[in-house]
Structures are given as structure tokens and as C-alpha cells.
Amino acid sequence: MPVPKKRTSISKKKIRKNFWKKKGYKAALKAFSLADSILTGTSKVIVL
């Protein structure tokens, strides 16, 4: 018989949300860094 799930605590929700935000921030930082290095010509990455 189905039973309602327990509610996720606010602190746990905030921790998960912050972790998710941090991953996005790091990805964006990496992308901007790569774009900057390509524009300045100091890139060591081969762009096709």
C-alpha cells in the first residue's frame, strides 16, 4: 500500500541546491576562462 514520503528538511534542500549551484558556477568559470585564453591567444587547446 502506498505511503506518503517524508518531507525533506530545509537544511538538506539548501545543501543540495548549493551543491548544484556550485557545479554550474565552476562550469561557467571554466568556459569563461577558456574563452578568454582563446581570445588573447594563450590557449593550449585545439579548437576545431
Swiss-Prot record:
GO terms, molecular function: structural constituent of ribosome
Entries under InterPro entries matching the protein: Ribosomal_bL32, Ribosomal_bL32_plant/cyanobact
GO biological process: translation
Subcellular location: Plastid, Chloroplast
Name used for this protein in its record: Large ribosomal subunit protein bL32c
Protein family (similarity comment): Belongs to the bacterial ribosomal protein bL32 family.
Protein keywords: Chloroplast, Plastid, Ribonucleoprotein, Ribosomal protein
Top-level taxon in the UniProt lineage: Eukaryota
GO cellular component: chloroplast; large ribosomal subunit
Ranges in a coiled coil: none
Keyword RNA-binding in record: no
